[in-house]
UniProtKB/Swiss-Prot annotation:
Catalyzed chemical reaction(s): acetate + ATP = acetyl phosphate + ADP
Domain of life of the source: Bacteria
Family: Belongs to the EutP/PduV family.
Induction data: Part of the 17-gene eut operon transcribed from a single promoter, induced by ethanolamine and adenosylcobalamin (AdoCbl, vitamin B12).
Deleted gene: phenotype: Not required for aerobic growth on ethanolamine (EA) supplemented with cobalamin (vitamin B12). A quadruple eutP-eutQ-eutT-eutD deletion is also not required for growth in the above conditions. A non-polar deletion mutant grows on EA from pH 5.5 to pH 8.0, but does not grow at pH 8.5, releases slightly increased amounts of acetaldehyde on EA plus vitamin B12. No visible phenotype when grown on EA and tetrathionate under anoxic conditions.
CC cofactor note: Does not need divalent cations.
Protein name per the record: Probable acetate kinase EutP
Length: 159
């Protein structure tokens, strides 16, 4: 079964998205430790990005995942992506999500440009984790990838 890890800075919206992909749109609490859902997907604490001493824990956590979803808030002007993180595991799929697009100070265009500059390619998803319609775009994309992999004979992501 394919596994997904959600990574990003403190307050980026990882846990909100992690929960929303399973239909839970309630207010997320701060993630204090690595959390797994019933499919083995991983929600990582933002502190793993904020403090270099935790990078080893982040890299170790990501070893067994197939897809890395990087969540970056639309009102965050800086990249906090640890150097080399996109190079961990050569076969990993990298997906970028611009979160908090509904915030008054959101700058989606600048955030998209920043994500492209640090190595992400389209599609880059723009969403509000509390809006089922915007989350649906990502769910549909993951389901389509799962179908493609299934047709190719690979194990599938759980939708």
């Amino acid at each position: 079964m394919k596994r997904i890890a959600f990574v990003g800075a403190v307050g980026a919206g990882k846990t909100t998205l992690f929960n929303a992909l399973r239909g839970n749109y309630s207010l997320a609490r701060k993630t204090q430790a690595v959390e797994f859902n019933d499919h083995g997907d991983i929600d990582t604490p933002g502190e793993y990005f904020s403090h270099p001493r935790w990078y080893h824990a982040l890299i170790t956590t990501l070893q067994d995942v197939d897809t890395l979803i990087y969540v970056h808030a639309a009102n965050d002007k800086e990249s906090r992506l640890p150097a080399g993180l996109l190079d961990v595991g050569t076969r990993k799929r990298h997906i970028a999500v611009i979160s908090k697009t509904d915030m008054p100070d959101a700058d989606v265009a600048a955030t998209r440009q920043l994500l492209c500059e640090i190595g992400f390619r389209e599609p880059i998803f723009e969403l509000n984790g509390h809006d089922p319609q915007s989350v649906r775009q990502l769910v549909d994309y993951l389901a389509a990838l799962s179908e493609q992999e299934e047709e190719a004979g690979e194990k599938t992501y759980h939708s």
